Structures are given as structure tokens and as C-alpha cells.
Design a protein with these regions (language model features):
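Histidine-centered catalytic/metal-binding microenvironments
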Residues: 461-475
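A Trp-anchored, charged/polar loop motif used as the substrate-binding/catalytic surface
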Residues: 301-310, 525-530
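C-terminal non-catalytic regions of proteins with extracellular/luminal or membrane-system context
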Residues: 1-29, 101-105, 109-111, 210, ...
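Extended catalytic-interface subdomain
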Residues: 328-332
């Protein structure tokens, strides 16, 4: 029995009846008029899960083990979007993967219609990629839950999402950051890291928890525990910087903020990613693509020293699930695996993707590091990024992954492959499954759902969802954190704070939508009373917000080098220098990667670093109305040659004295550097 065996939880039943037993109320989820063990909230989640698994059909078990993207009825990503429509009722098929663009062998179900997915394919886990207002999100969540409650066993839906609480003036990226602006907006992950404040992360995680659960989202694909040891990787901006102790502290605290000291009915479940560390990229290329599929470790002991500690911190905090990355580790690596986990006496690795490697998932993650929750694959490991197991059929890939510990498959909407794997195994095929192979994973998944309290009450109040999303205190914390995160790199001539009466020229340099963001910054300055001009010739001072970027799905190309030179990533360096030579210029560098600054820094009057910030909050810093406190969360490299020579598995702060950039005043732009105004 649970600790609160007699404490009546709130029961909300909309499609099924209730039962009264011993003066207590329970949901009659299977509709038989009797209290089944899985309906009895006095039992532990593990006991309830074991009972429910025993009642589930093979098809229901297979459906539970997929988590696919799902859209609202008016979503532009739905097959037939209809303005104002709440539920998407149309199946949608695709001939290529939506994230990697890899062609499928045959058309794949990209997303189910709501009722077809829940009632026919028995799916319960969904990825939310739309970005509606919180009350609309809550209404949609409730509608899905009511369909699920009306199913044979009444198993509720679990909605998950990538992060939603970071300010963004850049276009959204499918599969990475799709949503912003509807909840309290904090700086990007690197901006949080710039404050070196683990206690803040506990508060931040709690804000996410309150706002998401109020809107009917139950789990986050986050946060990233990856160490960004290769500066050219396009996902550096999703990390907490390069200091392994701070990253570990941050991952622990944000997980505790989201989940609490232990997972419970008010928790936001965390899926920490990408085990055992996705930052070890070959020349920056990502394993979403076949040319970036390998993890090659040049430094002995780097896995244990740098890449595993943040995941251990997540596990120590009770992270509900872990997501392995697509990569496959290679035997040209230095020695990084414990000898007892080597593939053979002479080979560390089987050279298959982490999700398919029993030594990584079951033996290292579960056995040695103590993971007690479930393993959630990354998107597309079966049909798009099956690195190292391409020779297997898709059902055989499902079978192999299940046997190596994967419990749920991301961005899958069709359980047919799992059912085919069981059919193959039960017909005697050695590379298939039997139904019993699905049951441990189903039990782990159901344990989370029971622990989250969704069997008793999965419904939320839309009005409350909107109120919590717009909570003034939470929004103020986010805005204050944005302002504090800014890093002062140089201001030795006193260019800052800006003078309101100085005629100011403003420019934003970025690859896409630069005029739009320039307009946002000009509007914010104008509202603050700053005198603006349209040309350099009229100006007495200038602000250039330099926003270079490496986009995962457009810049990572086969045979094309990835660069961290701003000139290669949307910045007109000649124009920047022209402005700097004409008038005293404050250069604001938005740091999503460790940029090479030798062409743009020397002629600037002042240099700041941002890590995603709204225009209004940046203006507050420029005018001296807010105090920037940030320190560099990444070491800025001296040159492209320094980047190429550095080991891809060691952070910049440990790459030696010849690695960091030194500015015109002699400041060394290494991890933790930053001045004050």
C-alpha cells in the first residue's frame, strides 16, 4: 500500500463511472462495476502497473510503447487544418523523416488522428509541437484525455514537449525548440549557465512544472545533459555550458525543480538527454545524418571525466527517463569504457547506436549508474537513423532495441512494427520478440503514469492554465534572469551605458529575418526614449546585435565543413567593421556556439554577450537600467585552427592556454570570464 493509502485524491471521471468502496471513491476504468487492483489508488504505482499489464492485450502493449507527434485540429502541421478545430481526426503519412529528411523505405504514419491513435492503435504518449495559448492547450489535452478514458481500460494520455520557457526571436526549429512566448520566458540554456546559480535552476524547473502541468503537459524532453566539447555542434545552445561540475549541478537542480524530491501527482516528468553524451561530434556533424553518426573519443578517460557525470546527477535526482543519442561509438577511440563493459577483449564497442547497445543501456546506464526509470529512444531510430543495424529489418530493429532496454520509441505513431517483431519471434525467429518481452517496458511506462496521478484526474482547468502561464511573478523572474544573464566582455572606453540623446544607428546581423529583429530592437529603444537614426552618416553611436547561428537541418551537410566564424553564419563582417570604424559601436554577440571573434571584436567600443534575450530586456541592459551578471559559459576559441586542433571530447576550458581568444585589451575569453558595468 502507498504511504497515503487512505488519503482520497481528487477523482474526475468524464467518460466512465466511479465506484465507492469503504467510503472512498475510485474510477471504474474498465467499466465492470468492480474495483480492480489497477483502479485502486491505495496500491503502489508498481503494483497497479503490474496488474494493468496483465490485463492488456498485445496490441495495447505495443501501442503504449510508441510516442508520436500529435497536432491540434487547426495546426498548420495537421493534414487538413481547420480554423478553430480542436482535435485532428486525420491520419497523415510521410515518405521522409520530418526531422532528418531521410527517405523512408515505404510511407510511414507520421501522426494519427486523435481517435484512431488512441482507440485503434492504443497510443498513449504524444509529443506536443504546436504553440497555442495555455488555455487552448488545456482544452486540447482534456479532449484527448476524455477519449482515452472512454477506451477499454481507460489508460490516460501523457503529453510531452521540448522546452517552452526560453525567449526566442529566431525561427522555431522542428524537433529542437518549437515553442516559445506562451509561458514565462527565460534566457536560453547557455544564459542560465552564465549565471552559475544552481539554486536558480531549482526555481526555473518549478516554474516549468507549474505552468506545464496547469496546461495539461506532463513530461519534458529535457534537459540536455550533454557536454558541448565540439564547438561546431549545432546543439551547443541547448546545453548548460562546458564546466562539468556546473552542468551536473544544473541538471540535478532543474530535474528536482521539475519533478520534486520524488516523482508525484504534481510533477513534470523529466526525460534527460542524450545519453551517454551527444557533444562528441566529428567536426561538429550531428548524428541525425549518416555523415555525423559516429562518436569517436580521442582522449582516454573522457567519457567518465566529462560526459557521464551530468547524467549521474540526473539519475541521483530521480530522472524519470533517459534518452540515448543516435550516435554509435567507434573502436578508433581512446580507452573510455570500463574494461568489464568492453564488447570483446580487444574491442570496446560493438559500433552500433547507443540505443541498440546493451552495454550502454542495460549494463552502464541501468546496472552501474542505477537508472530505475524507463528509456525513451530518440526520434527515428527505427526508420531513419538506425546506425549500425541497417542490416536488420524494421521489426528486427524494434526487437533489438527492446532487448537492449528501450521502453518507448520516439516520433513513432504506428505500433505495427512492434507487432510484426512479436509475430516473427513467436514464429521462432531469433531476431524477433515474444509478447512477454514487452511487459517490463510497459510496466515502467505505466508506473510513471500512475505516479503522476493521471489515472485519477488527468483533466485541467483552461482558465487556470492561462492564469498560471501569465503569472506576473513567474514572468518577472524570467525577464530579470534574461537581463542578469548578459555578459560584459569589454567596456574599457566607457561606451556603456548608452546615452539616450546620442543619435544611435541600430543593426541586427543574422541569417534570416534580420530586418524583423532590427525592427524589434529599434522599437524597444524608441520606447525607452533613445534617439534613432537610419544611416551611419547621421549617427553618433551604434549598436550591432550580431546573431550568427548554425542551423541543424540546413547547415549540417555532407562534405561541407561547419564553421564557428560569424562570417560563415549570417554576419556581414565587412559591414560590422565599417560601422565600428565610423562611430563608437557596442557589439552585442548572441552566443549559441563559441564564436571566433578576431574579425569583429577589436574595433568595437564595447562588447557584450547574450544567450537569447528579448529586445526590451537587452535595451534595459544597454541603458544601465539592469545589471548584467553573466560569465562566459563557453570558452571562445582563438581561431579556426585552434578549433580543429582541439580534441572533440574535451571542453574548451581544458584545451590549454593557446585555445582561448584574447581581446584587444588582453582579456582572455575563457569559461567563467566576464566583467561588470
Amino acid at each position: 500500500m502507498t504511504d497515503n493509502a487512505s488519503s482520497q485524491p481528487r477523482i474526475d471521471a468524464r467518460a466512465k463511472g466511479t465506484l465507492t468502496v469503504d467510503g472512498l471513491t475510485f474510477k471504474d476504468l474498465d467499466g465492470d462495476g468492480q474495483l480492480a487492483p489497477y483502479e485502486d489508488w491505495r496500491l503502489s504505482p508498481q503494483e497497479r502497473a503490474a496488474d494493468l499489464v496483465s490485463r492488456m492485450s498485445l496490441e495495447e502493449k505495443a501501442g503504449l510503447m510508441i510516442i508520436g507527434s500529435h497536432y491540434m485540429g487547426d495546426s498548420p502541421l495537421a493534414k487538413n487544418p481547420t480554423p478553430g478545430k480542436l482535435l485532428n481526426e486525420d491520419d497523415s503519412w510521410a515518405d521522409k523523416h520530418p526531422i532528418s529528411g531521410a527517405p523512408f523505405e515505404k510511407p510511414v504514419l507520421a501522426t494519427s488522428g486523435a481517435r484512431q491513435g488512441i482507440l485503434e492503435r492504443h497510443q498513449r504518449f504524444y509529443i506536443v509541437r504546436d504553440n497555442p495559448e495555455a488555455d487552448r492547450l488545456a482544452e486540447w489535452s482534456n479532449a484527448l484525455q476524455e477519449i482515452a478514458e472512454g477506451s477499454r481500460l481507460g489508460i490516460p494520455v501523457v503529453l510531452t514537449s521540448n522546452p517552452r520557457n526560453h525567449v526566442s526571436v529566431a525561427p522555431p526549429t522542428f524537433g529542437v525548440t518549437e515553442a516559445a512566448g506562451k509561458f514565462a520566458d527565460f534566457p536560453g540554456e547557455l544564459g542560465l549557465a552564465a549565471l552559475q546559480d544552481p539554486a536558480l535552476m531549482r526555481k526555473f524547473g518549478d516554474v516549468c512544472r507549474q505552468q506545464w502541468r496547469a496546461a495539461g503537459i506532463h513530461k519534458m524532453y529535457g534537459y540536455m545533459a550533454d557536454m558541448p566539447t565540439e564547438p561546431r555542434w549545432s546543439r551547443v545552445n541547448g546545453t548548460f555550458g562546458e564546466d562539468v561540475q556546473l552542468v551536473s549541478d544544473y541538471v540535478r537542480e532543474v530535474t528536482l525543480g521539475m519533478q520534486g524530491e520524488k516523482l508525484g501527482p504534481d510533477s513534470l516528468a523529466a526525460t534527460v538527454k542524450h545519453f551517454p553524451g551527444g557533444g562528441v561530434r566529428l567536426d561538429g556533424h550531428d548524428p541525425h545524418f549518416h555523415w555525423g553518426q559516429t562518436n569517436e573519443y580521442p582522449t582516454s578517460g573522457s567519457l567518465e571525466k566529462y560526459h557521464l557525470p551530468p547524467f549521474q546527477a540526473a539519475l541521483d535526482a530521480g530522472a524519470s527517463s533517459i534518452m540515448p543519442y543516435y550516435s554509435r561509438p567507434m573502436n578508433n577511440s581512446a580507452e573510455v569504457m570500463p574494461k568489464n563493459l568492453w564488447f570483446t577483449d580487444s574491442e570496446q564497442f560493438e559500433e552500433v547506436a547507443f540505443a541498440y547497445d546493451d552495454r550502454i543501456t542495460n549494463q552502464l546506464l541501468r546496472g552501474q549508474m542505477g537508472h530505475a526509470g524507463y528509456i525513451n529512444s530518440d526520434s527515428g531510430i527505427i526508420d531513419a537513423m538506425p546506425w549500425g543495424v541497417e542490416h536488420l529489418t524494421e521489426p528486427q530493429r524494434f526487437a533489438r532495441a527492446v532487448k537492449t532496454g528501450v521502453d518507448i520509441f520516439s516520433d513513432m505513431s504506428d505500433p505495427a512494427g512492434i507487432l510484426e517483431a512479436v509475430a516473427e519471434g513467436e514464429a521462432g525467429g531469433e531476431l524477433g520478440l515474444v509478447e512477454a518481452d514487452l511487459e517490463p517496458g510497459c510496466a515502467r511506462l505505466l508506473t510513471e503514469i500512475f505516479t503522476l496521478g493521471l489515472f485519477e484526474n488527468p483533466y485541467v482547468d483552461p482558465a487556470n492554465a492561462l492564469a498560471v502561464a501569465n503569472d506576473a511573478e513567474m514572468k518577472a523572474l524570467g525577464a530579470d534572469t534574461q537581463r542578469r544573464s548578459v555578459t560584459v566582455l569589454r567596456n574599457e572606453v566607457g561606451a556603456l551605458p548608452l546615452k539616450r540623446d546620442a543619435k544611435l544607428y541600430v543593426d541586427v546581423q543574422q541569417r534570416k529575418d534580420s530586418l524583423f529583429v532590427t525592427g524589434l530592437l529599434r522599437d524597444a529603444l524608441r520606447e525607452a526614449g533613445v534617439t534613432l537614426v537610419d544611416t551611419i552618416e547621421e549617427a553618433e553611436a551604434a549598436v550591432i546585435w550580431m546573431r550568427p547561428s548554425i542551423f541543424l537541418f540546413t547547415d549540417d551537410k555532407e562534405g561541407v565543413p561547419i564553421s564557428v566564424n560569424p562570417a560563415d553564419n549570417g554576419v556581414d563582417v565587412d559591414h560590422v567593421v565599417e560601422v565600428q570604424n565610423a562611430v563608437p559601436t557596442t557589439l552585442v554577440v548572441n552566443v549559441t556556439n563559441p564564436w571566433i571573434l578576431h574579425e569583429v571584436e577589436p574595433d568595437a567600443a564595447a562588447v557584450l554577450a547574450t544567450y537569447e534575450i528579448s529586445a526590451a530586456n537587452l535595451v534595459a541592459v544597454l541603458l544601465g537600467e539592469a545589471t548584467p551578471e553573466g560569465k562566459l559559459p563557453l570558452t571562445m576559441p582563438r581561431s579556426a585552427e585552434a578549433v580543429a586542433a582541439a580534441p572533440r571530447d574535451v571542453p574548451g576550458l581544458d584545451c590549454g592556454d593557446d585555445y582561448p581568444y584574447i581581446d584587444r585589451a588582453g582579456n582572455v575569453y575563457t569559461y567563467g570570464y566576464g566583467q561588470t558595468l
